[in-house]
Amino acid sequence: MKIEAVIFDMDGVIINSEPFWVEAELEVYGKYGLKMTEEMCNQMKGTRIEDVVNHWHSLFQWTEPSQKVIINEILEKVIYNIKERGKAMPGLLGLLEYLQDSKIKIGLATSSLYCIVDAVMDKLQIAGYFTGINSAESEKLGKPAPDVYLGAAKKIGVNPRKCLAVEDSYTGLLSAKAAGMFTIAMPEKSEYNLEKYNIAHLKIKSLKEIIELDYQGKLNLVNNIPVEK
């Protein structure tokens, strides 16, 4: 089956923003006396921010400030860091051009809110490449439920089984696989060898590898048949 669309996760896949979330969460939680660690924050990678804050509230049961206040403060800091320090992940622009030239539709399926998406698109100037953008903000359930990816496929008008999803988080991979998509995992360097990422059909270290994988016949972006798993 020919792949007709590539749907990207956002944070940690198209932009180097994953550390911004950890920094913001540690700073905001610490401000209100909540003792969090980087490892704790990373456990929730790929999860939408309201679900993250709700998870920690269920454990720590703080009374003030409200979850909404904490969410807004985290979002403000992440947006600031995207504007000041955000960079495209290596190989992104070349891959977007390759997909566009090959008439492959490009989508986005992210746990981040649309305000974060807007900041990323503005910083990287890549909005014109995307046929459809879907945030968990639009869905009843966030990742690992399939809703975000199914919604993205619907927006770009492609059967989910003809979509390739690129993810950096285990939570995101579960979402894309539940949606029936061919999956590529791109974990951060420190997590690359973790067994959990083997649920993906393929695993890469950089977006630069996707074009080469297509040339090698391991994808079906142009003329090849993807490896079944």
Language model regions located:
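Asp-based, Mg2+/Mn2+-dependent phosphohydrolase catalytic module
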Residues: M1-E4, E97-Q100, L113-K229
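Active-site neighborhood of HAD-like aspartate-dependent phosphohydrolases
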Residues: M1-N42
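An amphipathic alpha-helix signature
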Residues: V22, L26, G46-N54, I71, ...
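Helix-loop "lid/cap" segments that line or gate small-molecule binding pockets
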Residues: V28-Y29, R48-T63, V120, A152-A153
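Metal-dependent phosphoesterase signature
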Residues: K35, H57-G94
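Short, acidic loop-to-helix structural element flanking the phosphoryl-transfer center
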Residues: Y80-L108, Y114, D118
